């Protein structure tokens, strides 16, 4: 994941900052607790494709 991309992309729900989870290959919005998958190097920033991040994962 190109870290320059993280400076431009935002959560499609709240427009907040996304962080990169290297292990799970996801972009995570800590505000909405949503994780967006990265498929073949491309972030899929569609709310229906996101999974909810559990409280335990958010720690």
From Swiss-Prot:
Any one Gene Ontology cellular component term annotated for this protein: cytosol
**Pfam families for the chain:** Trm112p (PF03966)
In terms of InterPro entries, this protein maps to:
Trm112-like
Family matches, as Gene3D superfamilies: 2.20.25.10
Taxonomically, which superkingdom?
A: Bacteria
* UniProt record similarity statement: Belongs to the UPF0434 family.
Q: Which PANTHER family match?
A: PROTEIN PREY, MITOCHONDRIAL, ZGC:162634
Annotated protein name in UniProt: UPF0434 protein VS_2060
